[in-house]
Curated annotation (Swiss-Prot):
Lineage per the UniProt record: Bacteria, Pseudomonadati, Pseudomonadota, Gammaproteobacteria, Lysobacterales
Protein name (database record): Lipid-A-disaccharide synthase
Lineage top rank: taxon: Bacteria
Name of the gene: lpxB
Alphabetical UniProt keywords: Glycosyltransferase, Lipid A biosynthesis, Lipid biosynthesis, Lipid metabolism, Transferase
Enzyme class: transferase
Amino acid sequence: MTGIGNQTSGIETGVHDRAPADGEPTALPISHSPLPIPGAHARPPRFALIAGEASGDILGAGLIAQLRLRYPNAEFVGIGGDAMRGAGCQTWFDASELAVMGLTEVLRHLPRLLKLRSAFRERVLAWKPDVFIGIDAPDFNLPVERWLKQRGIKTVHYVSPSVWAWREKRAEKIAVSADLVLCLFPMEPPIYAKHGVDARFVGHPMADDIAYQADRDAARATLGLSASSTVLAVLPGSRHGEISRLGDTFLQAAWLVCEHIPNLHVLVPAANAGCKQLLAEQLSRSSLPVMRSHLINGQARTAMLAADVVLLASGTATLEAMLVKRPMVVGYKVAPLTYRIVKLLGLIKVNRYALPNILANDDLAPELMQDDCMPERLCVALLDWLKHPAKVAALQPRYLALHAALRRDASARAAEAVAGLLQGRDWSGANI
């Protein structure tokens, strides 16, 4: 995840008078903005936000930028990363503190997360925001939203939990937490409607950002690769746990592909310094030729654009690969205990896991999950794309149609919906 970055100075609260104890959340300084004074002139609107990972940080930054167009003097505070800070949000805690996933991982970090949540909600209540916006991270954000809503603060949940995939009854719990749910995918609002939740499809900001026609040659030039090269992008995740579980398997699969395609170039983008160190260790013990493997800082989208095929973990990255129109193979493993619990309880409602497959209701990308996620099977699936260009060409119009369905000027629509909630008016999105 992103680092703490530049910290803003603020009112002394005693938070930094001592070093935090083990497990205690690391607070960033509070806003300069004074608390509103009863009877004083109307102050600018105040928005508090929480984004728990890199994708949420980007969504938050886009929303902040659009809200500033409507409210130039608005104030923004919360939990976020570099993108939200760049958009003008004063972060009290960094988004990286919430970057855990899976049942066993969450349990290990639970005491620290509970302390952080308690510290944040007390602080934000004192700051008195007009609207609180929880971005993704439902297990962390929804209790905060419910707590603040009970105290009279309007609440928004941006990015619906995957209620279409598992635990649909979460929609009922969201009804008591959020006044408004902003959905990225069109299949989500109808599910919420069954549970009486005000949910709006705003589109996906990533679909707005990415051109319909991707420029592979420009991406390769950026990375110093020949236009005639055969390129595989390998993205085993943006979290330490994901990379630990998938990195060696993915790199072994890449080596097997190299055995069939000797001139293959393998791009391995690292989300941050910690991920880069772990990936470098995995590359050093892999069989990949040094001259054919390229560990790069960030630039995941550029790596996908440059690639002929992408091997990646299930998640938002699959949507990005679809939007840049690249064939992909999806692999994923969770901690064994997490997998056994999910299977035992029958929590998963879908037969597909990759977002392009779910959106299309079709098998556009091979999915190799858990025990099926092994180097030999991943290699076979990758070679199937590389050796059948007609199959790749047939995929393009399917991807293009999905791209168009998601391209809705999402940040502007989300900001308009939040503005409607703030001003106490209905919003249908019809005029956006």
